[in-house]
Amino acid sequence: HHPQWQRAKAWLEAGEIGTLRHVDAAFTFHLTDLENIRNRPDAGGGSLRDIGVYTFGSARFVTASEPVDLSARLILENGVDTFAQVAGIMEGPHGRFTYGSMTSMRLYNRQVVTFQGDKGMIRVEGGPFNANVNDMAEVELHQNGNRVITERFPTANHYVLQVEAFGRSIREGVAYPCPLEFVKGTQAMMDTVYNVGVEISL
């Protein structure tokens, strides 16, 4: 619902970065309190369930693509994944491209998604998954080695926009931008990652 994602999607669809080749996403924060719901296996904790939905969903939304091959490496603590590194291939209207993501509940705060093409790059940062909380929401378009267009959204509140979009769907019959079917696709991607994930240790 946040306009930064709408802008990234529009730039990609307009061919601003040429042919899409790779998407990379990272979402991390530091949380060691084992009583926190995110660290409890009985409450469905884990970095993937808590924040992997964002790294998966953002790539799927902007590119309108689905994974066709996935692998994952997981670090487990107390029965939950505190670190997950996912790699794969996605396919959709922009063709096939590689995908990589990293989520962790044991690293310093970081949120960024990049969409790399053969002629440019789109970078969504400034805390894009909880925009304007950690930093100002912004999206960048990099082209020609030294040209950068930056758009910032200091006042956009994606929670308000979500409620407004829902209201329009009810009152006017306008299509909801993130329907249940889309959410099911993100859950399917997560299920696959857990099925193919390999536990590693440091």
Regions found by a protein language model. Give the residues of each.
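A short glycine-threonine-serine/GTX helix/turn-capping micro-motif
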Residues: 43-49, 149-157
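Contiguous beta-strand/loop segments that form the cofactor/metal-binding neighborhood of enzyme cores
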Residues: 56-131, 160-175, 191
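Predominantly a Rossmann-like dinucleotide-binding segment in NAD(P)-dependent oxidoreductases
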Residues: 2-71
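Short coil/turn segments
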Residues: 28, 127-129, 154-158
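Short alpha-helical
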Residues: 2-3, 158, 185
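Residue-level signal for the nucleotide or nucleotide-sugar donor/cofactor binding architecture
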Residues: 3, 161, 178
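Short polybasic amphipathic segments
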Residues: 113, 131-144
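C-terminal helix-rich "cap/oligomerization" subdomain common to oxidoreductases
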Residues: 151, 165-202
